[in-house]
Amino acid sequence: MGGGSWQASPEGDIGRTDINLESTLNLDEENNQFVFVAIEHPIPLLPNIRVQHSEMEWNGDALVAAGTNLNGNPFVSTEQVAVSLDLTHTDATLYYEILDNVVDLDLGITARSFDGEASLIGATQQEAIDLDAIGPLLYGRVGVDIPLTGLSAHVLANWINVDEFRLIDWAAEIMYEFDLLPALDAGLILGYRSMLVELDELDDLQADASFEGYYFALQLRF
């Protein structure tokens, strides 16, 4: 189990008129928190379980031009708006340990549940999109332990690519693990995470955006 902070920067466009997250909506780097817990066991036929909850929120103010179209109702005039983008999600992953030695390899499937929205709120007009959805992702994780050092390196990813929806969420990290108590190990983690989201008129949603940056986490293992 553990938790940390991800310093994520948004890039790309959302909406039917390709509204840029940086230059138009003035969204910038934000610290977003995450927590996770994993349960592993020695029973061969039963998968291991990992659950992670990730906050992904950005807020700001912007001046949008007439014709700006987030979800079907273009702004009729230039207007100052409050901007909110929320991609908060929870992952439930079932996986098997294929290798568990100096090299670790886990493979499985993730159910990702988004609970968020995107909105532009002005004095005379507002637009909002609910970003509530559950989807399956392929999951993989590979790691290498450096013997006698407490150091290890890992790469993990969740991925899906179907007709109207593409999501690639990967992270690379280095962990230093040490004994905290006789029955408790602690790990300090430094990593880099990138999440790419492409939607092509999926339930009237359109996006081509990425969110990436460094993260730091603390892990406890019993």
Q: What is the role of each PLM region?
A:
Residues G3-S9, H53-N59, I98, A111-E117, ...:
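Transmembrane beta-strands of outer-membrane beta-barrel pores
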